[in-house]
Amino acid sequence: MNKTTRVMPAHKHIALVAHDNYKPELLRWVKENKDALQGHFLYATGTTGRILSKETGLAIKSLLSGPMGGDQQLGALISEGKIDMMIFFWDPLNAVPHDPDVKALLRIATVWNVPVAMNRASAKFMISAPQMAEEVSIEIPDYDAYLAERV
């Protein structure tokens, strides 16, 4: 597939997602990194967003709850180039009813070259990277070329 680039702005659009058993862990991480997150635009699936906003005071755009379509909403935002990175504390030991949606979300993040942190260690590396405060060019699929080849 042909590639093109898009520029992530200095003020990133960051998705925050956590399965039920990992919501307290994500909340703890967000509290620890509140100062670093304040300069960015934050999005979250429903329940997670409400908890994080209530407990931290951060402005967070809450989508639907994951099982009710929030994961798919987030995937659509990624496809539209509106999400720059994702922190997703998912539960590797327990299946969730919307596992196909979770897999689709991770797949679409990979397709569009969106950085994803899936645990505290990778989230720490991501949030502390110097590029967090800079514009960053990333390679993405050239959808126009893809469409032209297929039509």
Curated annotation (Swiss-Prot):
The keyword NADP does not apply. Its EC number is 4.2.3.3. PROSITE patterns: METHYLGLYOXAL_SYNTH, MGS. InterPro entries: Methylgl_synth, Methylglyoxal_synth_AS, MGS-like_dom, MGS-like_dom_sf. Keywords: Lyase. The keyword Lipoprotein does not apply. Residues 6-151 form the MGS-like domain. The active site is at D71 (proton donor/acceptor). It catalyses: dihydroxyacetone phosphate = methylglyoxal + phosphate. One of its GO terms (cellular component) is cytosol. It is an enzyme of class 4 (lyase). GO terms for biological process: methylglyoxal biosynthetic process. SUPFAM superfamilies: Methylglyoxal synthase-like. Substrate binds at H19, K23, T45, G46, T47, T48, S65, G66, H98. One of its GO terms (molecular function) is methylglyoxal synthase activity. NCBIfam families: MGSA, PRK05234.1. Belongs to the methylglyoxal synthase family. Catalyzes the formation of methylglyoxal from dihydroxyacetone phosphate. This is Methylglyoxal synthase. It comes from Aliivibrio fischeri (strain MJ11). The gene is mgsA.
